[in-house]
């Protein structure tokens, strides 16, 4: 069966976040660091698939304990999900022939960005373009990209469903609102959407706990459905529900603190917070 390793649980800036001197970052020890969200999967055919390429690529490959990924899948163009691409290049790893799976908009951005375009010329990456809803089949697994609404200044955003022999996993690190995402697929409830795509486990956007978490800037600039809202929509977990793990946590998110009321509320309702290095079998 396919083995999933969660390689990071933080929002794009990681934890601690650069220049943050608040208590949420100032007291974070080395063993408490959280890397930007990423995921690695080893398929039954021994191919290795990295989802999102962060600046902490080296640390995350050490967590994964695999050699270079044979495939890289990008959700979108926001920096925390792509700024590790350069580490595969001539100046660092010097990789060759990695298959880079992207949307059409992401393909156009990569080809128009000199530091990425030269990596195509050097053979570091070979581009494969996917379409939303397309089933991309491997020996025992299938990957399905799903378009979801999220700030699209540079490219669109895709979640991924990974279907193994026994389970299906949803990887949804970012989206704007549940209303927009569910509406796009003709659904009104989160459970309904999970059931529509036969999801057994999900890594989903947990960027903020509440709508009032950021100080000094409007949260409307960085829309994400707050975890408190998501669990209010879901209610307590039922035996038939998918396992849900919240990921992509902003450095301000109280879910990092296991003693917080937020953490205890999520756990008491049967949902979970992703753990860096955790594994799932599909």
What is the predicted function of each stretch?
Residues 3, 47, 97-99, 126, ...:
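Residues at the starts of beta-strands that form the adenosine-phosphate
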Residues 11, 79, 107, 209, ...:
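Residue-level marker for beta-strand->alpha-helix junctions and adjacent short loops that shape enzyme
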Residues 45-101, 200:
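Active-site metal-binding motif and surrounding structural segment of the metallo-beta-lactamase
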Residues 72, 100-102, 170-171, 246:
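Structural beta-sheet core signal
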Residues 92-97, 104-129, 252-254:
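Active-site neighborhood of divalent metal-dependent phosphoester bond hydrolases
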Residues 168, 176-277:
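Cap/insert and terminal regions of metallo-dependent hydrolase folds
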């Amino acid at each position: 069966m396919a083995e999933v390793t969660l390689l990071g649980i933080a929002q794009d800036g990681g934890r601690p976040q650069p220049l943050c001197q608040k208590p949420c970052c100032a007291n974070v020890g080395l063993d408490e660091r959280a890397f930007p969200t990423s995921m690695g999967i080893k398929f039954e055919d021994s191919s290795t698939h990295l989802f999102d390429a962060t600046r902490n690529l080296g640390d995350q490959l050490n967590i994964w304990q695999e050699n270079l990924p044979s495939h890289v899948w990008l959700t979108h163009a926001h920096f925390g999900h792509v700024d590790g691409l350069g580490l595969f290049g001539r100046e660092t790893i010097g990789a060759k022939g990695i298959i880079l799976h992207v949307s059409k908009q992401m393909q156009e951005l990569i080809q128009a960005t000199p530091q990425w375009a030269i990596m195509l010329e050097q053979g570091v990456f070979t581009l494969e373009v996917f379409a939303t809803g397309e089933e991309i089949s491997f020996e025992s697994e299938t990957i399905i990209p799903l378009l979801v609404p999220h700030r699209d200044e540079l490219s669109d955003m895709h979640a991924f469903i990974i279907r193994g022999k026994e389970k299906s996993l949803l990887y949804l690190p970012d989206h704007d609102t549940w209303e927009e995402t569910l509406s796009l697929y003709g659904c009104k409830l989160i459970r309904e959407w999970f059931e529509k795509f036969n999801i057994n486990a999900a890594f989903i956007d947990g960027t903020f706990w509440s709508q009032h978490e950021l100080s000094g800037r409007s949260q409307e600039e960085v829309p994400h459905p707050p975890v408190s809202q998501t669990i209010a929509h879901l209610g307590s977990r039922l035996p038939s529900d998918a396992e849900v793990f919240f990921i992509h946590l902003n450095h301000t998110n109280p879910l990092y603190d296991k003693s917080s009321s937020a953490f205890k509320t999520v756990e008491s309702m049967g949902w979970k917070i992703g753990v860096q290095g955790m594994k799932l079998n599909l």
